[in-house]
């Protein structure tokens, strides 16, 4: 099983608490992390909770996302040693987009800049 397949099969519910913890450890809030997820994927609070309750894997989390934000192409930079804009695998790129946005939140970047609207 290659690394991408391993990530695809990971439950979003298993990773979500780490996103929240990363934000909170740096003085940011769960609400801000959730807002980033809503912005990126189009999920709302109820739909996100359903994904968590169902233990949906990352592949389906992104494939079933209500509406990926049209401004995702504005997300650039390096995360986990990869330039997000150069990742060719569409699901892996979306995973890294989310990682990048949560990382920016934890680094203290203003929400207006993170959300790139």
Question: What feature does the model see in each segment?
Answer:
Residues 1-117:
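A charge-rich, low-complexity, intrinsically flexible signal that marks solvent-exposed coils, linkers
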């Amino acid at each position: 099983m290659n690394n991408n397949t391993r990530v695809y099969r990971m439950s979003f519910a298993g990773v979500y608490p780490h996103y929240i913890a990363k934000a909170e450890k740096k003085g940011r809030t769960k609400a801000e992390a959730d807002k980033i997820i809503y912005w990126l994927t189009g999920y709302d609070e109820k739909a996100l909770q359903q994904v968590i309750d169902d233990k949906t894997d990352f592949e389906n989390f992104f494939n079933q996302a209500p509406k990926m934000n049209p401004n995702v192409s504005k997300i650039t930079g390096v995360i986990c040693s990869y330039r997000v804009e150069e990742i060719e695998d569409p699901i892996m790129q979306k995973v890294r987009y989310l990682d990048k946005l949560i990382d920016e939140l934890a680094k203290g970047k203003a929400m207006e800049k993170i959300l790139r609207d």
